[in-house]
Design a protein with these regions (language model features):
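Generic alpha-helical transmembrane segments
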Residues: 825, 905-920
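Alpha-helical transmembrane segments of multi-pass integral membrane proteins
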Residues: 111, 862-877
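Membrane-water interface at loop-to-transmembrane-helix junctions
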Residues: 850-869, 895-907
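Transmembrane alpha-helix/helix-exit interface in multi-pass inner-membrane proteins
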Residues: 302, 834, 871-883
Length: 998
């Protein structure tokens, strides 16, 4: 037995080394448009005889010339490269620079053997800590984004491993990869189409193209030449790679293989579509650049000022200056931000998963909350992708059937006015049952039932086998128990459906009535009506009048305008148990009845019309409410489908996407637009697109993005993949979605429910709010640290940080202390703010604009204001413990100053930590007081308690004293720290009062 995976991996070899040029050889080889030329012309263009196919020798020559029938794939990105890409961040560059400077300072100091100086450790501790931080962040990012892009490989998996072809006049089964342009492929029910081709023979051929075109039902195929170019879904004389045959047989000339097929073009689009940064990633990069630029400017200002005033006298001055640069870099960069952001987003991913939304890329969690437009495919996304009989129109009236999908659960509902007349109601219901019985008898579909246990309960699922339209008739018949009317019938012959005949019939014998034969027919109402001479009304049969015909045709038109697919139903009792006794029936040479399929003229006439059925792929019941909620949240829903314009407009109207009477714009109309400006004007107002190709979907998404929208694109078919990948956030259906779409998407809906998107939007908006909260909290700490270092250096003489007469630079806080604050004491409260519950108004706000900053000018004002206050109280607290500062004029020697400086640093260190704990309470809202809902987030209080325990540890555990340059503090010193830190909270409350007063 051949292993399937191994077979596929052999079939789809990597042809990327030639950048698709080699694969492009397999583009369409005809010199004419195959859908607009007759089959013989196409055959001549490809040099093939329709009766014998290619010779083996010619097929081999073409395989060598055009290459294998496979899809090109891009070379995988090496793992090491993916890991290194995690370091592509301005803040990381700044920290790497700080690491380099720290190492230079350490090497210089070691080389000059300066004992006792700061940074004179046996190992470059600062550099080691920073590098470890960077590695941890990179590993976290790599783990989250390690899934390789497999979209093209998934596209490849759609192709059938083997194909029947005609070569040297014989049908042979060959590997699909060996199919070449000019081959004659032989198609039968259940086959997958292995290449694009022009049909030249078709018998009752129907092909499922939903994954490629979005068409809900299998498409009837014919060999007629098209009079003009048509959209992909309307090319009835063409077959396409990756689709499948649901009924009938056919033969086609291969016109395109590999990357030249329609699936290949989509694969090429996916290769050409680059992954863009999410809005959140762009914002974080912007913040990184702002911080990096600020610290560089401050460092240059400080170093230039020191050079002009102090000068660099010896190696001590160089080392001190380098350590100052490291301190500034460490102070400016929120080292824990990347890890905190990753954890907060990961927690959001878990919460979304509970709502059946599986997010593949972390940053996409927030992006969905920012979406201003949701572009959705129709089939399988907004609708169930399960054809359903909704209306049955009989000569006496009409009934509606409840229930959707393939579960045979529902009932007949008669018009309320008719309900008052029991006799009329009974007649209509009886006629409806008879109509559905005919539809279920003249049927090749099958409804399969399967049971599955889930805990103590057993769930039943229903599977459609065959044409979905035919299965819908079986489902409808079972809903009204019409199966009882045909339980005794046994099929003895069939006249199959063809696209030319537009009808099908069976001959069945009634075993409960001496085997008497009846013809049951169904088909396009206008066609079937032409073969009817009688009509069944109220339990009696009478001649069909011209008035009856006009009324039936008017009903057909009305149903069609409502996007229903209509099927007429008729029958004819043959009055005998023997076909041979039917007048006009032909016998063969042996005296037996000739093939029934060839005797439609005899059997399909004098039919009795019983009624017609309206079928539709219904909208999902919950989607209308979801569309309305999205609208209230300022989110526009756009339908983009390959289906018929009438169907698209009807579904869109039902769901509230457009108003009643609204229409759909087609792909051909989009092609007529002259330029991007005209295209953008259309997309700014149109909300329904029909009969569109994958290229159109991609252009629509790109146009909406050009207008400043954050676009989410949902879909399930392969035709959706390029647009799904290009959108700011692509959303794939988990159950009905093709593998290629799942791989292209950033999020997958496990329940295929459009409504799940709304829950995900709510979660995304809440996450965005929380990101703003902890960014305000973290960055105010960093700004406070930068101003502490900057102010401490520039005012060192006034504050007593540098004793009178000394030379060189003394940094107020050590880099290791700043790292402790940024990584440990700040991290827990930031994480706690990241899981704050969403506010009630989160879905009442309009989506944020693409130009809106995560940190806007007002928030920067908050951050800088709090940061300056933090720095001021920190430096004041340090000064109070240093002789020769603002609060004391006592002199101190170098040794005494070093001891005081250690205590002062411990004070400043602790004041900053206390100030940040109080700032955590204030940062939960830009306007509301910190005392509103003070205890609503229990995790925040737990985080504050943890941070305080860590601060106690770094001050009172001896080996941490040594590592972080701290000393134990007295009770009085703790009171001082808390009192000074309270000034930060008081200042924040006063600022909020002023803002609220405005």
């Amino acid at each position: 037995m051949v292993d399937r995976k191994e077979d596929q991996s052999t079939q789809f070899r990597d042809t990327s080394s030639g950048n698709f040029e080699q694969a492009a050889k397999t583009a369409t080889q005809t010199q004419v448009d195959p859908s607009l030329a007759d089959a013989q012309t196409v055959a001549q263009s490809l040099g093939v005889d329709l009766n014998t196919g290619l010779s083996q020798a010619e097929a081999k020559r073409r395989l060598d010339k055009y290459g294998p029938n496979e899809l090109a794939s891009a070379p995988p990105v090496p793992k090491w490269k993916k890991f290194l890409e995690q370091f592509k961040d301005p803040l990381v560059y700044l920290l790497l620079a700080a690491t380099g400077i720290s190492l230079v300072a350490w090497f210089i100091e070691r080389a000059n053997a300066v004992p006792g100086a700061e940074g004179g450790e046996a190992l470059p501790f600062d550099a080691i800590v920073i590098v470890l931080i960077l590695i941890v962040n990179a590993v976290l990012g790599y783990i989250q984004e390690s899934k390789a892009e497999a979209a093209v490989e998934a596209l490849s998996s759609m192709t059938a491993p083997q194909t029947n072809v005609l070569r040297d006049g014989k049908i042979e089964r060959i590997n699909t990869v060996d199919v070449v342009p000019g081959d004659i492929i032989v198609l039968g029910e259940g086959d997958s189409v292995s290449a694009d081709g022009r049909l030249f023979a078709a018998a009752s051929l129907r092909i499922a193209e939903a994954s490629l075109t979005g068409e809900s039902v299998p498409v009837g195929k014919k060999t007629d030449t098209l009079a003009q170019a048509k959209a992909l879904g309307d090319r009835a004389n063409m077959v396409f790679n990756g689709t499948s045959v649901t009924q009938g047989t056919g033969r086609a000339i291969v016109t395109s293989t590999g990357m030249g097929t329609q699936v290949g073009k989509i694969a090429d689009l996916l290769q050409a579509t680059e992954d863009d940064e999410t809005p959140l990633q762009k914002e974080m990069n912007y913040v990184s650049k702002i911080l990096g630029s600020a610290v560089c400017i401050i460092a240059v200002v400080v170093l230039v000022a020191l050079a002009l005033t102090e000068g660099f006298q010896d190696v001590h001055d160089v080392i001190d200056s380098l350590l100052l640069a490291v301190s500034l870099a460490v102070a400016a960069v929120p080292e824990g931000l990347a890890a905190i952001l990753t954890v907060v987003l990961a927690l959001g991913v878990q919460r979304m998963a509970m709502h059946n939304a599986i997010v593949k890329k972390l940053h996409s969690v927030e992006t969905l909350g920012s979406a201003s437009v949701i572009c959705s495919d129709k089939t399988g996304t907004l609708t169930r992708n399960e054809m359903t009989v909704e209306r049955v129109v009989t000569p006496s009236g009409e009934v509606q059937l409840t229930g959707t999908g393939y579960a045979p659960e529902g009932r007949m509902v008669v018009d309320p006015q008719t309900m008052e007349h029991a006799q009329i109601r009974g007649i209509i219901e009886s006629e409806a049952v008879a109509t559905l019985a005919v539809g279920a008898l003249a049927n090749d579909g099958e409804l399969r039932e399967s049971a599955a246990s889930a805990g103590n309960a057993e769930t039943v699922t229903w599977e459609a086998v065959g044409d979905p339209t035919e299965v819908s008739l079986i489902v409808a018949a079972r809903k009204v128990k019409a199966n009882r009317k045909y339980a005794n019938y046994e099929r003895v012959g069939e006249i199959p459906f063809t696209s030319e005949r537009k009808r099908m019939s069976i001959v069945a014998q009634d075993n409960a009535d001496a085997g008497r034969l009846t013809v049951f027919s169904k088909g396009a109402p206008d066609v079937l009506l032409g073969y009817c001479s009688r009509i069944a009304v109220g339990g009696a049969v009478r001649p069909l009048t011209e008035g009856d015909r006009q009324q039936i045709l008017a009903t057909v038109e009305q149903l069609s305008s409502d996007a229903y697919r209509t099927l007429g139903q008729a029958y004819r009792p043959l009055g005998t148990a023997s076909l041979a006794q039917v007048p006009g029936i032909m016998l063969n040479s042996a005296g037996h009845v000739a093939d029934i399929a060839e005797q439609s003229d005899v059997l399909e006439n004098d039919l009795i019309w019983v009624g017609m059925i309206g079928i539709i792929d219904p909208p999902r019941t919950e989607v209308r409410d979801s569309v309305a909620e999205a609208h209230r949240a300022g989110i526009r829903t756009v339908m983009i489908t390959g289906d018929h314009p009438l169907t698209a407009a009807r579904i869109a109207t039902d769901l509230g996407i457009i108003d009643k009477g609204g229409t759909a714009m087609t792909g051909s109309q989009l092609d007529e637009l002259p330029d991007e400006a005209a295209f953008d004007k259309v997309t700014s107002g149109v909300s329904v697109y029909a009969r569109v190709a994958p290229e159109h979907k991609l252009k629509i998404v790109e146009s909406l993005q050009r207008q400043g929208n954050i676009v989410a694109m949902t879909g399930d078919g392969v035709n959706d993949a390029p647009a799904v990948k290009t959108a700011d956030i692509g959303v794939a259906m988990g159950i009905t979605g093709t593998e290629v779409t799942k791989q292209s998407a950033k999020m997958i809906l496990a329940d295929d429910n459009f409504s799940t998107i709304v829950a995900a939007v709510r979660e995304g908006r809440g996450i965005f709010d929380n990101i703003r909260k902890f960014l305000r909290y973290l960055l105010s700490s960093n700004v406070g640290e930068v101003f502490t270092v900057f102010g401490g250096v520039m005012l060192a003489g006034f504050l007593g940080i540098t004793p009178p007469g000394s030379q060189g630079v003394t940094v107020p806080l050590l880099a290791t202390q700043l790292l402790w604050i940024n990584l440990l004491t700040d991290a827990a409260p930031a994480l706690a703010m990241g899981v704050d519950p969403s506010t009630d108004d989160v879905m009442a706000r309009k989506p944020r604009k693409l130009t809106d900053r995560v940190i806007d000018a007002e928030m920067w004002g908050d951050i800088i204001f709090i940061g300056v206050i933090m720095a001021a109280v920190t430096l004041i607290g340090m000064d109070m413990h240093l002789d020769g500062g603002l609060f004391t004029d006592r002199s101190v020697d170098a040794i005494g100053h070093d001891a005081q400086m250690t205590e002062a640093r411990t004070m400043g260190f602790t004041i900053l930590v206390f100030a940040q704990m109080l700032n955590a309470l204030a940062s939960r809202s830009h306007l509301q007081s910190a005392f509103v809902g003070l205890f609503s987030n229990k995790w925040l209080w737990g985080a504050i308690a943890l941070s305080m325990v860590l601060q106690l540890a770094v001050i009172y555990i001896p080996f941490l004293n040594t590592a972080f340059g701290t000393v134990p503090l007295s009770v009085g010193a703790w009171v001082e720290c808390l009192g000074l830190a309270m000034i930060v909270l008081i200042a924040s409350e006063l600022r909020k009062c002023v803002l609220r007063a405005r």
